[in-house]
Structures are given as structure tokens and as C-alpha cells.
Amino acid sequence: KNKDDDALPQLNVLFLVDQKSGLPIFYRFYDGNVPDVSTIRHTIADQALLNMKNVVLVAGKGYNSVKNINDCLINKVEFIFNVRLGTKGCLARELIDEHRKEFADLNSGDPYIRKNSATAKVNWKYDPRPVDGKPASNSATAELYCHMFYDPVIYQEAADKLTESLLTIKKKLLENEALTEQEEELKEKFFRNDKEKGLIIINRRVDDYLKYKGFRVLVTDSEKDPVKAWTAYADRWRVEDAFATLKDRLGCNRIRCSDNKALQGKTFVQFIATGLSLMVRSRIRCYMKENKKAGKLNLVYESDAKILQVLNNVMQTRFNHGYYFDEVAGKKI
């Protein structure tokens, strides 16, 4: 099944939009089973054929492989990749551990993105002319920026969810109730029988499980500012989220398309609609940068729905020869 839970092969859509203006530039279909390395290489080739300049590839955790980073460096294509944190001993975890004290400092928090952040520079080695079947020479180097972000709210939500699950399991075991398959897995991972205390939760394993919750690491070769890197990645997520929302609202699911031409047509409509959504966000961002005087509308980097909810209170009165805006009412965010 695909991400829509349909019994159909996965289809992916690659979007390229102008971050500053939100204008849509380019999109294409490709099969969901295409390896991430191939996707990145084809994207680099596409932007070269279209003679596009100042392109920055922004991608999620599925595209942060060493090969993809090397391909971008070799082809001089700038990138911002989200890094996986699930592997023990990985570089991202090591960097987080080195900077934990900084995340505990309230001064590391940014009021715009509402996250604590820290940045580390990494000297990255790669082969500028790789040859299949031969060991990498790693003769070239590049300076990468690893921007780390911590959200205590996400951490607390994960901790509360796990605590609730473990206490429910313990209650069921004490009352000899049957456990679900998922609860059995949690039991094997977080519980043990103590000779004196009986059934207990292994706190060390809970701490290990929660150790990197709430963290995100973005690696980039070009963006030194952590807030700008976060904003660029958040825009990528906004595009994906807006596309998924519009797919449902516009009836663009494949089960509602009569043939491939109808699917392609509806996808084009979504492409334009998603671009409009990003254009609204881009204009709001311009307002935030240019209007920092007291008394101006104070916006943080929230979802489209929350921002539009605030703007929904702005009323306009029209006359034959003009118009004016009424008083702005409502809670500022």
C-alpha cells in the first residue's frame, strides 16, 4: 500500500518553487520505488538542463545519505538535508551530545521559530571524481554546517505518551489482562521482573529512548544562519502538507481519477494551488522582516491555518471611490 493507504504503487511528485516569492517553477512525477540517490541525481540534471541558478535542494530524512551529499558537493549544488537520528553512534547524535548544555540555556531559543538552536561546523571529506568499483579518494574537503534544534514541547509530548503507555501496561499486567501486540513489544523493551520489587520499569531504557526526542539536525553547505535553514526546511514541509491537504480537498486522489491524463491534470492544479499557498506565506514573511515597529501585527512562524485565522478578523469597508480597513481585533500570536 502507498501513503494514502490505497492498494496502488506509490507515486511521488517533486516540486521546485521560489522560496522568496513562493512562485512555482517546476514539478515532475516519478515512481515511489526510485532510489533516493537516483532522484537527487536526476534533479541536479533537471536544474542544469533548465539553466536554473541559485538552486538549493531541501529534502527530508530519506535523502540525507553520504552519496547524496557528495553528489551535491561535486556538482556545486547547495543543499539543506534533514538528518536521521535513529542510528547509534551517528555524527548527528555526537554533535547533540556535545552541545546539550547550550540547549538548556534559554538564551539559545529563537522567538521566531520558537526552538533552541546550536550550530557546529564539520570538515567533510569526499571524492571529487568517484569511479565505480574503486575506493573513494576523499581528497576534497568542504565545510558543512550542522544546525541543531530542540523543541521541549515535542520532547514532553513523547515522554507523556510513553509514560501513559507504560503505566497502562503495568496496570494490565498486575490485573492479569491481555496485552496488545504493540504493548507486548513495549513490555519486552521497558520492563523486567525484580526479585524484591516484582515488575518494574527500566528507567535507563526510558531515558535512552527519550534522549534525542525533540531534536532535529539540518546539514547544509551554504546556510550559516540556523533560523534561515529552519525556515527553508519548514517551507518544504509546508509545501508537502499543503499538497496533501489539497489532494484531499480537490479530489485528486488516484482512486478519483479516471485515467492517467486526469491524474496529471489534477496534479497540475495542485501544483498551482500549492504555489499560491506558499506565496501567501512568503508575503507574510516579508511583512515580518520589514515591519518590526511596536504596534504592528506580531506573527510567529505558525501554520497557514493559524495565520489565516488571525488575518480572518481583518475587515474591509468599500465605497464607490475607495475603501478602508476596520480595526484589527483578535488575539495576536
Question: Where would I find each of the regions flagged by the language model?
Answer:
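Anion-binding and metal-coordination hotspots
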Residues: 1-333
